[in-house]
From Swiss-Prot:
Region (Mn 2): 65-97
MF annotations from Gene Ontology: microtubule binding
First-listed, main subcellular location of the protein, grouped into a coarse class: cytoplasm
Region Mn 8: start-end pairs: 267-299
Record GO cellular component, one term: centriole
Organism: Macaca fascicularis (Crab-eating macaque)
Name of the protein this chain belongs to: Stabilizer of axonemal microtubules 1
Domain observations: The Mn regions are involved in microtubule-binding and stabilization at low temperature. They are required and sufficient for cilium targeting.
Domain of life, per lineage: Eukaryota
One BP annotation, GO: cold acclimation
Stretch list, region Mn 5: 166-199
Mn 1: annotated segments: 30-64
Ranges for region Mn 3: 98-131
Amino acid sequence: MKTKCICELCSCGRHHCPHLPTKIYDKTEKPCLLSEYTENYPCYHSYLPRESFKPRREYQKGSIPMEGLTTSRRDFGPHKVAPVKAHQYDQFVPSEENMDLLTTYKKDYNPYTVCRVDPIKPRDSKYPYSNKMEYLPTYKADYLPWNQPRRQPLRLEHKYQPASVRFDNRTTHQDDYPIKGLVKTVSCKPLAMPKLCNIPLEDVTNYKMSYVAHPVEKRFVHEAEKFRPCEIPFESLTTHKQSYRGLMGEPAKSLKPLARPPGLDMPFSNTTEFRDKYQAWPTPQMFSKAPITYVPPEDSMDLLTTVQAHYTYPKGVPARSCRPAPQIRKSGRFEGSSTTKDDYKQWSSMRTEPVKPIPQLDFPTEPLDCLTTTRAHYVPHPPINTKSCKPHWSGPRGNVPVEGQTTYTISFTPKEMSKCLASYPEPPGYTFEEVDALGHRIYKPVSQAGSQQSSHLSVDDSENPSQRKLEVSA
């Protein structure tokens, strides 16, 4: 028999199983075709979907197999490629003649006798001249001053005369916006109105009344297997050691050259070509004077240096210093004048008054009342409670037959009103089997005959106190 869930048993469209976002009960990987879109928007079989705008594939593959030749292979045929012949050089045959060991320098440059050159040293000027030198620089001799008249300045005539009135130190903002006192404002807060209803709000909903908490299975925890050490001893052999065994061969020979090749038993001469041709000159022995034995003086020390004792000032007066005398700073004003100071005198600066625009508005002297147009002209009115025109509920209507000959009464066929099977906690004729991975409650029919009898229920079954209606929010 085919199993059904609440979604399939419902005939009124208000009951369905909770569609869980994750498969908390799932232990298999089965695709779920139910989604929020397919649940809220059912498909209509009378409406055909529109055709796709995707272009159709009108290209048909040819039955002839394609050749494996490209344009390059067809146009460019292979050529015979011969290996490049390497150039063979002639075998080197050493000559039997002896090398003369002569260079171009030895042939072109003949040796000359070398002698010591006296040092070029300027003459010592031990005796300076006492006469004063008369000199005139080239600039003063070639460039003489001209006697030209003084140029007149090209500046404009000074016509600005500052105002003699004292500046009052007031701004435009201070003149136009004087300081005003505090203004008493009227509160716009509405008055406290009495509450129309003192009944507390009920927080009981259909979800709280009809919600049944399902037991959650215990989470499966994977236990890791315990580590079991290997009982076979470690042989320290790798795949490389087992597959590649070393073969016995000849021992390696040393390629190190001999410490002293044969034929070089002669001692090494430490003379070079430079040492043979350029011998050291005979240097005379330095004359050294024997030191005089020190005899301490018997008189007292005069504390005079050699310069003070042997060199006196000429004419008895010490030499004057050529350094200019330091200038004494004066606290007074410097009275030196120049062309710029004579032509450009310091102006007597005065603070200029700001250019104020002519006031075109007459501002009121009274303080601002801080009232808007709405506050000034709006008159508050007491709220008026309007009467409701909604008719009173006369209670549930009975199954009264429709009177009158109308198209509805003629064509209407009364049918027996059946109650939705999903509104019962346990649908009659079905037994609960399991809860799906997506949260669907699966029910299995008891028998084929019993399910047909239980599907046609009367309206009076709702009055049975043993069966309580299950309200599920759609």
